[in-house]
A protein has these predicted regions:
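C-terminal and inter-domain tail/linker signature
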Residues: 1-137
């Protein structure tokens, strides 16, 4: 799998999972069985638990769409980095009232690729800024 194929893998993940119609079954195709994501200091392990986490996130950020602002693979071709923007409608993010306000936040995801699938991810989001945005709305 070339570096450009790995970049396409990240694009496909965002397009199929994080954009409507939010195809959670695509996770089985795009991720390894033991996929791990570290986000907000928490580790989610396995595709089943990852699907549940994505579904919960999509319930609090209705109609979520993600777009890559930048995406590239490292020289070795085993890592992909994406700077992204997520947009949606607040439906109770951070346990705050579901006020229907539009939300937008940025983040960085670093994926490890194994045998043509996403195997591990580390995500940092602009959660503090998003929280403040929601508290002001």
């Amino acid at each position: 799998m070339s570096c450009s194929d790995k970049v396409r893998l990240a694009h496909e993940f965002f397009r199929r999972v994080w954009s409507p119609p939010h195809d959670l079954d695509a996770i089985d195709e795009l991720m390894t069985e033991d996929y791990r994501i570290t986000t907000a200091g928490k580790v989610i392990s396995g595709r089943r638990d990852f699907k549940a986490w994505v579904a919960a996130m999509q319930k609090t950020c209705v109609g979520a769409t993600n777009e890559h602002l930048d995406v590239f693979a490292n020289a070795a071709g085993n890592m992909i980095v994406s700077r992204f923007r997520t947009r949606g409608i607040n439906n109770g993010m951070f346990g705050l009232p579901a006020d229907g306000a539009p939300v937008s936040f940025t983040g960085i995801a670093i994926w490890r690729v194994e045998n043509g699938r996403l195997a591990e991810c580390w995500v940092e989001r602009s959660a503090f800024e998003l929280y403040n945005q929601l508290c002001r709305s």
